[in-house]
Each structure stands twice: as structure tokens, then as C-alpha cells.
Swiss-Prot record:
Residues 1-23 form the signal peptide. PANTHER family: NEUROTRANSMITTER GATED ION CHANNEL. Belongs to the ligand-gated ion channel (TC 1.A.9) family. Acetylcholine receptor (TC 1.A.9.1) subfamily. Beta-1/CHRNB1 sub-subfamily. Glycans are attached at residue 164. Residues 24-244 are extracellular. After binding acetylcholine, the AChR responds by an extensive change in conformation that affects all subunits and leads to opening of an ion-conducting channel across the plasma membrane. This is Acetylcholine receptor subunit beta. The gene is Chrnb1. Keywords: Cell membrane, Disulfide bond, Glycoprotein, Ion channel, Ion transport, Ligand-gated ion channel, Membrane, Phosphoprotein, Postsynaptic cell membrane, Receptor, Signal, Synapse, Transmembrane, Transmembrane helix, Transport. Pentamer of two alpha chains, and one each of the beta, delta, and gamma (in immature muscle) or epsilon (in mature muscle) chains. The muscle heteropentamer composed of alpha-1, beta-1, delta, epsilon subunits interacts with the alpha-conotoxin ImII. Pfam families: Neur_chan_LBD (PF02931), Neur_chan_memb (PF02932). The modification Phosphotyrosine is found at residue 390. It comes from Rattus norvegicus.
């Protein structure tokens, strides 16, 4: 029994360890060896004057948003930092072929690279993931980050604009004499000169399109750190993005154009409809609502006025003038000979000369035609039916009082006046017949005055129609030219073909 137990113990001790157990033990021994005398606060420079080279790369995972109001860009990125720490090198042959280790970020020296133009005061990365250490002493750290960086917004051509936003990274604690920055390599090992985007994992933004994404290393003099005059190095990543204007075209610009068309057709609406002022004021209030909605989208700056605000203001000015001119048209339409006398130049310009050029033609007045009487002088009919028809029908006023025109009234015909007012003996008519003729003459004068009054009132209405049509064509020209001038200017505002021309 004792012999069996002894053989079992010897068998267990003689069995080789599993590969995983041996690997874990080897990594543990290697970590203990590397970090026994390691100080993470000491810069990994063999000499005091040596500089530690740190390469910085950036992988863009998502352009989350660009807040024009707060001038802030939100991005989801992966920062790629790589440097050499001579204290973390070993010979793989002496440690079971181990070529890389993964250790916590707090246990090694970090170059203290932060986003300088952050907008929320948070300089740290989103997650302190482990660093990868290779046997040559190369240390690589790829922490993810949700950054909110400041971005100066140029609002002149909003919403047909493009923006140049930057992300500035630098070592916060070391100057260029201690830490040397450079752009990191791309996946092919070449020196990277732009932000890397992985097509398979990148999430496209629905409002912005990335045009260029270069990077640049700059040197800034005059930086005092540690009580001495030094230089600071910064790696700047540029995002040159162009706005996709479809949202504003459909929801803002197209309704504004339709409202402008309503303001134009105000001048095509007849004044008797009674809705000219209501339609104009409705269009003005609608544009005011659009202006208030856009005020929350653009930055509060006095450096420039966005192009869409220019168009809204231009449209509001036109609609305001349409309200004023509608008042003028209504004033002309409701004038009468009792209140206003039409000047000669108004008659010549707006009645005789201007209408043909505006596509207006005044219809000719139609006079009542007296039908030819067909009387039968039979004993049955006699004179009764013919005289009844004659006095029932309205005679033309010019039949009794012929005039050259209605605007220069003349006295009745001299022969008729002598016929009416002449001495009874000369006329030789009975008194009853003379009274009938006098009554007919009075009614003819009243009818003529009413006809002249209506004709002059129709002249004012026709002048109002001509002025309305003149304003219609004027507004069409001004609206078309103004819209083209405002928006054609934006077509020349394109991103540069090269990021650094």
C-alpha cells in the first residue's frame, strides 16, 4: 500500500506541465523580471538629453455630430500611440518564445498625450485598455475615446457650406526636447499622413460628408514648461467635411419658395375678392416662423450672415412690399369721381400707353342697340303698341344729348333746347307735351351723369388693375433675379481639391 502511494507521487511529479500552465508561469516570471525595478513615472530615455519618439495615429470610427450652435464636433475615435521603452525588452529565447505581453496602462510610462482643443474639459480617454509590449521594447496603446472638440463654424454659406474641424493632440507634460511626436504608420507600415478610416466599421453621418482627412505635425515655439523656454510639438488631425443640404432644401428652402409664389400671386388676385391683405400678411407671418426656427440652428455670431437667412430676409422684404403695394392697389380700386379727380398723366400712362405692354386690353363699351320697330299699321294695332315699346325701352343718352366725349360734357343740342324752352307760340305744342319732353330730358341728364360716374369709376378700377399687373411682373423679375444671385453664389463655395493647397 505504501509502495503504491509512493509510485503515484513520483508519477505526478514526473508528468510535464500543460502548455498553458507553463506559458502563464513564463509570462509571470517575465513580468516579474521586467517590472521589478520599473518606475512608470520615469521617462524611458537612456540619457538625459535623449528624446523619446512617440508616433500618433487616429482611427475614426464615427463622426457623431457637429453642433453649429455650440461650435462643437463629437467623434468616436481610436487613438494609436506607439513608442519605445528600452526597459521593457527581452530575449524571447530565454522566456519560452514569448514575443509580446499585455499589461495595464497604469503599470507603464505613458507619453501623456491629450486632446488640447477639447470642449468639455475631459482630457482622459474613454477606457484605459491594456498596452501591448513587444520583446524589442516597443509599446503600443490604442485607447478608444469619445471626444468633443471645438470647431470654428463658418456660417456664411449655410446650408451649402463646408467646415474645417481639427483635433489637436500634444503631450501635456513634456516639451519637444523630451518627447518627439510624429504621425503614426498606416496598416501597411507606411507613415500615415491622414486619419485612418476602416470602411467596414465606419458609421457614416447623415448630415456631413468627409472630403479630406489629413494630418500635420507642427512646432510651436515659446512654450514654458518646467521653468525653461522650450518648444511644443502638436499633431493636428483635420476633418474637412461638406454638409448634405437635402434636409434644408426640402424643409426650409422649398417652402420659402412656395410662400414667395403666394406673395407674387397676391397681385393676380382681384381686389374685389377682399383677400389681398390677408394673403400677404399670412405669407409674412409664415416667413417669420421659418426665421425663428433657423435662429436655433446657426451660431450666434455677428461675423457673417448665413445665405439662407439672407434669402429669408430678402423674401420677407418682398412680402412686406407686397403688403404695402396691395394697400396702394386697393386705394386706387375704390376711388371714385366724387373723391378723386384722375390726373391727365395717369390717364395717358396707365390707360392708354402701359396696358399693351403688360398684356392687358380694355374691352370696348357696348351700347344698347335700339331694334328696328316693325309696326303694322292695321286698324287693330294702331299706334298704341309701337309707342308703348318706344317709351319702355331705355333710349341712349346721346340720342337726346350728343357729346364729343363723356369727359367734356356739353349742353343739350341747341335745336332741342329751343324746342323745349322756346315760346309756346313759336313751338305750337300743348303744355302737356312740353312737360313730358322736359321730364324725358331730365331723366336723360340723370342717366348721362350716372353713366359718366360709372365710367370714371371703371377708369380708376382699370388703373388699379394695370398697377397690380405692373407689380406682378416686377415681383416676378425681382424674385427670380434675387433668388438666382443669392444661391448661385453658393455654387462657387466648394471644398478645396487638395487639403493643403
Amino acid at each position: 500500500m505504501a509502495l503504491g502511494a509512493l509510485l503515484l507521487i513520483l508519477g505526478i511529479l514526473g508528468t510535464p506541465l500543460a502548455p498553458g500552465a507553463r506559458g502563464s508561469e513564463a509570462e509571470g516570471q517575465l513580468l516579474k523580471k521586467l517590472f521589478s525595478d520599473y518606475d512608470s513615472s520615469v521617462r524611458p530615455a537612456q540619457e538625459v538629453g535623449d528624446r523619446v519618439g512617440v508616433s500618433i495615429g487616429l482611427t475614426l470610427a464615427q463622426l457623431i455630430s457637429l453642433n453649429e450652435k455650440d461650435e462643437e464636433m463629437s467623434t468616436k475615435v481610436y487613438l494609436d500611440l506607439e513608442w519605445t521603452d528600452y526597459r521593457l525588452s527581452w530575449d524571447p529565447a530565454e522566456h519560452d518564445g514569448i514575443e509580446s505581453l499585455r499589461v495595464t496602462a497604469e503599470s507603464v510610462w505613458l507619453p501623456d498625450v491629450v486632446l488640447l482643443n477639447n470642449n468639455d474639459g475631459n482630457f482622459d480617454v474613454a477606457l484605459d485598455i491594456n498596452v501591448v509590449v513587444s520583446f524589442e521594447g516597443s509599446v503600443r496603446w490604442q485607447p478608444p475615446g469619445l471626444y468633443r472638440s471645438s470647431c470654428s463654424i463658418q456660417v456664411t454659406y449655410f446650408p451649402f457650406d463646408w467646415q474645417n474641424c481639427t483635433m489637436v493632440f500634444s503631450s501635456y507634460s513634456y516639451d519637444s526636447s523630451e518627447v518627439s511626436l510624429k504621425t503614426g504608420p498606416d496598416p501597411d507600415g507606411q507613415e500615415r499622413q491622414e486619419i485612418y478610416i476602416h470602411e467596414g466599421t465606419f458609421i457614416e453621418n447623415g448630415q456631413w460628408e468627409i472630403i479630406h482627412k489629413p494630418s500635420r505635425l507642427i512646432h510651436l515655439p515659446g512654450d514654458r514648461r518646467g521653468g525653461k523656454e522650450g518648444h511644443r510639438e502638436e499633431v493636428i488631425f483635420y476633418l474637412i467635411i461638406r454638409r448634405k443640404p437635402l434636409f434644408y432644401l426640402v424643409n426650409v428652402i422649398a417652402p420659402c419658395i412656395l410662400i414667395t409664389l403666394l406673395a407674387i400671386f397676391v397681385f393676380y388676385l382681384p381686389p374685389d375678392a377682399g383677400e389681398k391683405m390677408g394673403l400677404s400678411i399670412f405669407a409674412l407671418l409664415t416667413l417669420t416662423v421659418f426665421l425663428l426656427l433657423l435662429a436655433d440652428k446657426v451660431p450666434e455670431t455677428s461675423l457673417a450672415v448665413p445665405i439662407i437667412i439672407k434669402y429669408l430676409m430678402f423674401t420677407m422684404i418682398l412680402v412686406t412690399f407686397s403688403v404695402i403695394l396691395s394697400v396702394v392697389v386697393l386705394n386706387l380700386h375704390h376711388r371714385s369721381p366724387h373723391t378723386h379727380q384722375m390726373p391727365f398723366w395717369v390717364r395717358q400712362i396707365f390707360i392708354h400707353k402701359l396696358p399693351p405692354y403688360l398684356g392687358l386690353k380694355r374691352p370696348k363699351p357696348e351700347r344698347d342697340q335700339l331694334p328696328e320697330p316693325h309696326h303694322s299699321f292695321s286698324p287693330r294695332s294702331g299706334w298704341g303698341r309701337g309707342t308703348d315699346e318706344y317709351f319702355i325701352r331705355k333710349p341712349p343718352c346721346d340720342f337726346l344729348f350728343p357729346k364729343l366725349n363723356r369727359f367734356q360734357p356739353e349742353s343739350p343740342a341747341p335745336d332741342l333746347r329751343r324746342f323745349i324752352d322756346g315760346p309756346p307760340r313759336a313751338v305750337g305744342l300743348p303744355q302737356e307735351l312740353r312737360e313730358v319732353i322736359s321730364s324725358i330730358s331730365y331723366m336723360a341728364r340723370q342717366l348721362q351723369e350716372q353713366e359718366d360716374h360709372d365710367a370714371l369709376k371703371e377708369d380708376w378700377q382699370f388703373v388699379a388693375m394695370v398697377v397690380d399687373r405692373l407689380f406682378l411682373w416686377t415681383f416676378i423679375v425681382f424674385t427670380s433675379v434675387g433668388t438666382l444671385v443669392i444661391f448661385l453664389d453658393a455654387t462657387y463655395h466648394l471644398p478645396p481639391p487638395e487639403p493643403f493647397p
